Amino acid sequence: MPELPEVETVRRTLCPRVVGRRIRRVEILTPRQIYHPDPATFAADLEGAVFDDIERRGKYLLFRLGPRILVAHLRMSGHLYVCGPEAPRPRHLHVVFHLDDGGELRYADQRKFGGFHLLGPGGEGMPPGLANLGPEPLSPEFTPQVLAERLAGRHTSIKAALLNQALVAGLGNIYADEALFCARIHPAREAGSLTPAEVERLHGCIRRVLLRAVERRGTTFSLYRDGEGNEGDMYDELQVFDRAGEPCPVCGTPIRKVAVAQRGTHFCPRCQPVPEGVALSPRRARPGRRGNSVRVAAEPPGTYE
């Protein structure tokens, strides 16, 4: 699933191609990808609208069109990109926004989990997930104190807490694992058990990991592409995610993959000791995107500078 760095990269690559453009027509090939309003109203209301700006909130893209906001959620495999009308149409193409310069803003989605909400002038139709998002981890408002307050008293694992979009917006499986490795905290640790020093270290690691991933334009395994159709470059810098069986870049201990918060979770059993009394369910390691090749830029925990 595209996480904050991938969605931010899509936003940055779409802005120069879309902002200022007028929608001539909306072609809806798969009506189920339109969540609000009904597809016919959706297409009619957007005809003639101009893209004023594109913003991001967590994993959501927000297209501002005058008093209206078009919300896009890519979920597992959604892909928003701009191309010319002559470009071949992919098999899983669902929505096409025809622009006044002849270009097309296309939405493709192999698994069909993503889609669109068109909000009314008063915010009508806002998806609950967007309305309940926690703080942006790269914003000034996200401080160690804010993170500590949101983790306090929570008995879930710290991995589950980081995946909870109502606590912190934008983190997913990849960067939760990377941030916890950077902070030397086991993913199964009880969230409320972290010490002030550990919370501060985790806060810094979340920000460093995300900033580096944004700089590297996100992580591509198979489906993710940016708004121009390009892959992200972060894969070879991942320290633990998708590295099961490979040596830890710090101590050489083989990286393990287990189930935490019902998600495949990667960690170093030496750098991130298993909490006492916690039983872990192993997960089968799959070959990495490049055949489980050795990573190019292994960095020890706490770096990502």
Curated annotation (Swiss-Prot):
Gene3D superfamilies listed in its UniProt record: 1.10.8.50, MutM-like, N-terminal
Binding site for DNA: H92, R111, R154
SMART domains assigned to the protein according to its UniProt record, in alphabetical order: Fapy_DNA_glyco, H2TH
Keyword Amino-acid biosynthesis: no
A molecular-function term among this protein's GO annotations: damaged DNA binding
Positions of the catalytic residues: P2 (schiff-base intermediate with dna), E3 (proton donor), K59 (proton donor), R263 (proton donor)
Zinc finger residue extent: FPG-type: 239-273
Keyword terms: DNA damage, DNA repair, DNA-binding, Glycosidase, Hydrolase, Lyase, Metal-binding, Multifunctional enzyme, Zinc, Zinc-finger
Family: Belongs to the FPG family.
Self-association and partners: Monomer.
Protein name: Formamidopyrimidine-DNA glycosylase
Organism in which the protein naturally occurs: Symbiobacterium thermophilum (strain DSM 24528 / JCM 14929 / IAM 14863 / T)
Annotated gene: mutM
